[in-house]
């Protein structure tokens, strides 16, 4: 009963770990989409204000109407992008409500349009956390379940081996002679006997023992393979996390540069030193760069989350 309880506890830990991973993954997916919607909306509002200024210039004859048409076409592309991002954001918000529940278990409505400024991310990773996560691999619930299964099989194998052993019984009996013959005996007589028996049907017992020994070898191999697989998954997640940190730095630099170039191009256009084609290209690059920067930052969160997931440490949130 104790082994069965321990097995269920290890299995429950594994299930909770997977459930938390899916829920938090859905949260960061919604968070990414919501941030991207806000970024594009802000740029689109700025572009709309600029459109009004261009309309005024066209009406005054300072600017050709075709220039305004090109600008409107660019704004339309931004609005289409915004609509797609909103669709993605709302879909993730709907999925998130399945995981986001009240203490009573009721699904909560997610305010999909207003992501928090600080999500208080609990899964950040540093050198100390990496050491803790590595140590946790030895107590992974997948391994615990298999070790407990091994223990059950080992116990059965021990019982099967004992069943094949011959049985020795030492018996002692005491008798008193109360006969009436001429040589009547007084007192008692003690007899000692040794009984040796070998269990019948030992072929069946041997077959059962061989089957259990085969199961022991199978579980040992499976345990070793699982340990290696868990370690490999963690190491892969660690490599991805390191790369994600580098990409965040590069994408942030790229976004800042794209913003500067777009601002410079607007100044050049107003001075008559640039055309609408280049201006639109700079604006599109700025939007793409901001979207990629947000994606890179959220990818880093996902990478940290994966490290905790592979170490089976997500269940600790419930403790």
Spans of model-derived segments:
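A glycine-rich, aromatic-flanked flexible loop/lid motif
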Residues: 119-125, 164-167, 183-194, 230, ...
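Amphipathic alpha-helical coiled-coil segments
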Residues: 15, 19-40, 49, 92, ...
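Small/polar (Gly/Ser/Thr/Ala-rich) solvent-exposed segments
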Residues: 1-15, 154, 163-190, 197-210, ...
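Periplasmic alpha-helical coiled-coil/stalk elements that build and connect Gram-negative outer-membrane
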Residues: 15-132, 240, 244, 285-286, ...
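Amphipathic alpha-helical coiled-coil scaffold segments and their short linker/junction regions
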Residues: 67-70, 102-170, 317-319
């Amino acid at each position: 009963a104790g082994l069965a309880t321990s097995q269920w506890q290890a299995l429950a830990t594994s299930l909770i770990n997977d459930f938390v991973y899916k829920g938090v993954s859905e949260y960061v997916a919604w968070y990414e989409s919501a941030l991207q919607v806000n970024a594009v909306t802000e740029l689109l509002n700025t572009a709309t204000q600029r459109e009004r200024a261009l309309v005024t210039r066209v009406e005054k004859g300072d600017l050709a109407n075709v220039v305004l048409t090109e600008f409107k076409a660019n704004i339309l592309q931004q609005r289409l992008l915004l609509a797609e991002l909103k669709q993605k954001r709302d879909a993730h918000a709907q999925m998130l409500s399945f995981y986001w529940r009240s203490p009573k278990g009721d699904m909560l409505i997610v305010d999909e349009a207003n992501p928090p400024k600080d999500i208080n991310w609990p899964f950040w990773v540093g050198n100390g956390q990496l050491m803790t996560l590595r140590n946790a691999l030895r107590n992974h619930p997948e391994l615990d379940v298999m070790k407990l299964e091994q223990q059950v099989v080992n116990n059965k194998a021990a019982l099967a081996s004992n069943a094949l052993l011959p049985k020795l019984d030492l018996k002692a009996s005491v008798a008193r002679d109360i006969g009436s013959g001429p040589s009547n005996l007084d007192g008692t007589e003690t007899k000692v006997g040794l009984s040796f028996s070998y269990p019948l049907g030992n072929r069946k017992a041997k077959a059962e023992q061989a089957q259990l020994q085969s199961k022991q070898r199978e579980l040992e191999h499976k345990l070793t393979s699982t340990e290696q697989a868990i370690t490999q998954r963690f190491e892969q997640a660690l490599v991805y996390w390191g790369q994600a940190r580098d990409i965040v730095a590069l994408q942030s630099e790229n976004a800042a540069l794209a913003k500067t170039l777009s601002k410079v191009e607007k100044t050049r256009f107003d001075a008559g030193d640039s055309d609408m084609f280049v201006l639109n290209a700079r604006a599109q690059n700025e939007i793409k760069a901001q979207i990629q920067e947000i994606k890179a930052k959220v990818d880093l969160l996902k990478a940290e989350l994966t490290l905790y997931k592979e170490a089976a440490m997500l269940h600790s949130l419930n403790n």
